[in-house]
Amino acid sequence: QDLALAQELVLEYPNGLLVEGDSLVVAAWGKPEANFSTKVPGHLYRLNLTTGAKTLITSKPTGNLDGLESDGQGGYVVSDWVAGKILHVAANGDTRLLRQFKQGTADLAYLPESRTLILPHMLENRVQAYDLSADFK
């Protein structure tokens, strides 16, 4: 049976998804205009899988979020497709820039044990791995 977790207005145009226990962590794009730009970018937030209740992880709009992975320490590594940013979002919502690239940083893979980011550069038609060890001391 299908389960609707939340109404469209609270979802902020979900893009990246990650299940953690009884929660769905959502990387939101923000409400797109006709050209996919946004007046208000999306947040990173958590939806309770039982109640559908939404809890913001980032208190401010974070970006046009795409890729989402756990950092293995209670936080997240996320990509902003439009801005070309790779961000770290700590468990408390603090956000910092890890890497800056050209537009097109899409879904990603992050391997916490080796601190390796595997990132598609969609508009450049390439995939590259990055060592983030220095970013997670």
Question: Where would I find each of the regions flagged by the language model?
Answer:
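Short loop/turn segments that connect beta-strands within beta-propeller blades
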Residues: 1, 48-52, 89-94, 132-135
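A short beta-strand motif characteristic of beta-propeller blades
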Residues: 2-9, 52-59, 93-99
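Beta-rich, blade/repeat-based domains predominating
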Residues: 8-31, 38-41, 59-75, 102-115, ...
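Flexible "stalk/tail and boundary" regions
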Residues: 21, 87-93, 112
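A short loop-to-beta-strand structural motif that recurs across blades of beta-propeller domains
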Residues: 43-45, 85-87, 126-128
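Lipid deacylating catalytic domains
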Residues: 46-47, 58
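Structural signature of WD-repeat beta-propellers
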Residues: 80-81, 90, 121-122
